[in-house]
Amino acid sequence: MEAAAEPGNLAGVRHIILVLSGKGGVGKSTISTELALALRHAGKKVGILDVDLCGPSIPRMLGAQGRAVHQCDRGWAPVFLDREQSISLMSVGFLLEKPDEAVVWRGPKKNALIKQFVSDVAWGELDYLVVDTPPGTSDEHMATIEALRPYQPLGALVVTTPQAVSVGDVRRELTFCRKTGLRVMGIVENMSGFTCPHCTECTSVFSRGGGEELAQLAGVPFLGSVPLDPALMRTLEEGHDFIQEFPGSPAFAALTSIAQKILDATPACLP
C-alpha cells in the first residue's frame, strides 16, 4: 500500500500513551484494552493502536474479529467500535486472512508496518491514543518510539505481575524507557490476587506488592493493582465491555482508579 497522500494523521491526537511489559503473559493487552474503555466511559474519545504484531489479541477482546479495514483519502480508516465513534482500533489482526494466522515476518517488514500504522491511520480527533506494544524490548519498540517521537507521547505505562521474575523484567523495561527518553507514567501490577466470584473476597495467588515496591525504588508512580477476576476474563473472551457490565467489581474499581490517575496526570490543556 502506498503512503497516505497527506501526512499528519496524528495531528488531531492530543495524548499518546504506550503500554509496555518486560515479558509476555502479564496481561499487558488486557490493561491496554480496559484502560481505553475506562477512558472512553470517562467521556474521552479514544483510539487503540495494536502494534503487538505477533500476538494481536485486542480485536478479539473488543469483539471486533473479522472486521474489515477500509482505505480513505488519508490512508486507513480505523475500525470504530461504537455508534458514537468514541473508540476506535487499528491492529494487524484486521489484515490477516484468518484470526489465528501466524505473522512470520523479519524485523524490517515489521518495522515498516509499524511506521505505516503511525503515519497512515486516519484517527481524526482523539483525546487519547493507547498503543499496545509487544512484550519485552526489541527493534519493534524502537521503531514505535521513533515513529511517535515527533508527536511527543505523554509517556508509558509498564505492566507487571507480583512475581519476582516479572518484576526483574520490569527493571529492564524501566532502563529501556530511560535510555530512549520515554517518560514512565507509572507501574500497574496485574493479577494481584484472585477475586472470588461469589463473595468478592480477594485471595493472594502469587506474592503481592512487588510492583509497588519496584515503583518506590525506581521513583515512579504506582498506579494500582488489578486482581484476577473471572468476570473480566469472561468479557475479554466474549468481546464485551467489562467496564460497562461489572461496575461493582474490585477489578472495575482498580481499572477506573488507574484511568483517573492518568486523567489527573494529563496536562491541563486537555478539556
UniProtKB/Swiss-Prot annotation:
Tissue: Widely expressed with highest expression in skeletal muscle.
Name assigned to this protein: Cytosolic Fe-S cluster assembly factor NUBP2
Taxonomic path: Eukaryota, Metazoa, Chordata, Craniata, Vertebrata
Family: Belongs to the Mrp/NBP35 ATP-binding proteins family. NUBP2/CFD1 subfamily.
SUPFAM superfamilies hit by this protein: P-loop containing nucleoside triphosphate hydrolases
Cofactor(s) needed: [4Fe-4S] cluster
Subunit-level organization: Heterotetramer of 2 NUBP1 and 2 NUBP2 chains. Interacts with KIFC1. Interacts with NUBP1.
Top-level taxon: Eukaryota
HAMAP family: Mrp_NBP35, NUBP2
Role of this protein: Component of the cytosolic iron-sulfur (Fe/S) protein assembly (CIA) machinery. Required for maturation of extramitochondrial Fe-S proteins. The NUBP1-NUBP2 heterotetramer forms a Fe-S scaffold complex, mediating the de novo assembly of an Fe-S cluster and its transfer to target apoproteins. Negatively regulates cilium formation and structure.
One example of a Gene Ontology biological process annotation: cell projection organization
Residues the record lists as N-acetylmethionine modifications: 1
Protein location: Nucleus; Cytoplasm, Cytoskeleton, Microtubule organizing center, Centrosome; Cytoplasm; Cytoplasm, Cytoskeleton, Cilium axoneme
Molecular functions per Gene Ontology: 4 iron, 4 sulfur cluster binding; ATP binding; ATP-dependent FeS chaperone activity; iron-sulfur cluster binding; metal ion binding; nucleotide binding
InterPro entries xrefs: Mrp-like_CS, Mrp/NBP35_ATP-bd, NUBP2/Cfd1_eukaryotes, P-loop_NTPase, YlxH/NBP35
Main subcellular location of this protein, as a coarse class: nucleus
Keyword Nucleus: yes
Binding residues annotated for [4Fe-4S] cluster, in chain numbering: 196, 199
A GO cellular component annotation in the UniProt record: cytosol
Keyword Repeat belongs to the record: no
Residues the entry annotates as binding ATP: 22-29
Cofactor binding, per record: Binds 4 [4Fe-4S] clusters per heterotetramer. Contains two stable clusters in the N-termini of NUBP1 and two labile, bridging clusters between subunits of the NUBP1-NUBP2 heterotetramer.
Keyword line: 4Fe-4S, Acetylation, ATP-binding, Cell projection, Cilium, Cilium biogenesis/degradation, Cytoplasm, Cytoskeleton, Iron, Iron-sulfur, Metal-binding, Nucleotide-binding, Nucleus
